[in-house]
């Protein structure tokens, strides 16, 4: 019997926005995956593909998140910074916390694209919180 085909699993991108103090890639937004999550998926036999944000100042071509959702077998949403409270209808408890609107919008669009085609969506830490928000849930902003 031939071996089962490997699953193609997307991994949402993490962002490092342009930073003039960064010694390399100054002025450029970086998109990346966290190595241990990619290795965890690979250890289960999956082919792992980062799903880059298709928008921004350097966007080229016509590839969309919908294309990735059709092609891949599922998506894992990365961890990271807290989801901005405005995304679930609340004002931030602390004014200085502005969140990462670019990443929030990207992550919400990824979840929407995969949900529309009925593909599995899994979240790690922030990713799980974001899935909750994408489907209409709310969060506690701070637990003391």
Feature locations, PLM:
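N-terminal beta1-alpha1 cap of cysteine-dependent amidohydrolase-like domains
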Residues: 1-122, 133-140, 144
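Glycine-rich beta-to-alpha active-site loop
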Residues: 123, 128
């Amino acid at each position: 019997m031939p071996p089962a085909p490997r699953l193609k699993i997307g991994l949402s991108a993490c962002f490092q926005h342009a930073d003039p103090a960064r010694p390399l890639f100054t002025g450029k937004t970086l998109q990346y995956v966290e190595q241990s999550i990619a290795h965890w998926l690979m250890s289960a036999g999956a082919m792992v593909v980062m799903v880059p944000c298709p928008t921004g100042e350097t966007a080229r071509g016509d590839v969309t998140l919908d294309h990735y959702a059709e092609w891949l077998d599922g998506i894992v949403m990365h961890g990271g910074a807290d989801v901005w409270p405005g995304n679930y209808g609340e004002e931030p408890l602390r004014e200085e916390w502005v969140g990462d609107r670019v990443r929030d919008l990207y992550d919400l669009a990824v979840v929407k694209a995969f949900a529309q085609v009925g593909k599995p969506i899994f979240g790690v830490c922030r990713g799980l919180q974001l899935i909750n928000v994408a489907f209409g849930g709310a969060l506690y902003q701070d637990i003391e």
